[in-house]
């Protein structure tokens, strides 16, 4: 069997549709999806198998990255550094741009990225044929910069095989790097954490999802059930009250929504216990971000 394998960094501005694209390619719910921008915070590896036209069985390891943005908050700096690291580690990049975005995001990407890349134009199902053609024409002035330009729709599964074919074309022949049926090397507890975060985006408005995070305190895997004990961190007591809701109605909705998604992904029953705490300025403190896994502790000599 002829095989290829390689790491591909998936880059884009917040809300370009990166996580939706990956979940569609995987036919599974692993990456956090929200209609709100900048939901993804940590890099995730998603493994997509694909047989190309030349007969190669390719293992494409996507590095799902936080959206490219510049903010002074320490958490946002950590997110940007993860995206930059992914670009450095990958042999190929895919820059995903919404058909409705201007070219500034891509121009910023060109200043940051030294790797060969494919430009993918997303959400074409939400634009007219004329609008799509116009945007493709606008990007043509950068044709010397990208390897290929692929218009696509993750929601409608349009041109996804075209994208995978383009990626496989530029990967080197190699033995597979992961087991055949593995979709991600993420631990289940980390996937569950992201599912809880997604539920926060689903049920809470305004700034609360952006000023909150989730810590898994205890995770017990049993044959027929996973037991998850977690707490939701917010910055203000007023936010804590909103997350809990009157008579606990909001936290129940968040918990039920998250638990059902966990059971779908884990393919077994899940017991979920959620608590809420207020911790002022957690997103600006290095110790808090270390505990949450956004900053790795420096090794002492």
From Swiss-Prot:
Region (G4): 122-125
Cellular location(s): Cytoplasm; Cell inner membrane
PROSITE patterns: G_ERA, KH_TYPE_2
GO molecular function terms listed in the Swiss-Prot or TrEMBL record: GTP binding; GTPase activity; ribosomal small subunit binding; small ribosomal subunit rRNA binding
Ranges where the record places region G5: 152-154
A cellular component term, taken from the record's GO annotations: cytosol
UniProt keyword annotation of rRNA-binding present: yes
Residue ranges of every copy of the KH type-2 domain listed in the record: 204-280
Gene3D superfamilies in the record: 3.30.300.20, P-loop containing nucleotide triphosphate hydrolases
Region (G3): 64-67
Domain Era-type G: 4-173
InterPro entries linked: G_ERA_dom, GTP-bd, GTPase_Era-like, KH_dom-like_a/b, KH_dom_type_2, KH_sf_prok-type, P-loop_NTPase, Small_GTP-bd
Transmembrane segments: none
Topology of this chain in the membrane: Peripheral membrane protein
Residue ranges of the region described as G1: 12-19
Keyword terms, alphabetized: Cell inner membrane, Cell membrane, Cytoplasm, GTP-binding, Membrane, Nucleotide-binding, Ribosome biogenesis, RNA-binding, rRNA-binding
Region annotation (G2) ranges: 38-42
Positions with a binding annotation for GTP: 12-19, 64-68, 122-125
Family: Belongs to the TRAFAC class TrmE-Era-EngA-EngB-Septin-like GTPase superfamily. Era GTPase family.
Subunit comment: Monomer.
Function summary: An essential GTPase that binds both GDP and GTP, with rapid nucleotide exchange. Plays a role in 16S rRNA processing and 30S ribosomal subunit biogenesis and possibly also in cell cycle regulation and energy metabolism.
Protein name according to UniProt: GTPase Era
Species annotation: Helicobacter pylori (strain G27)
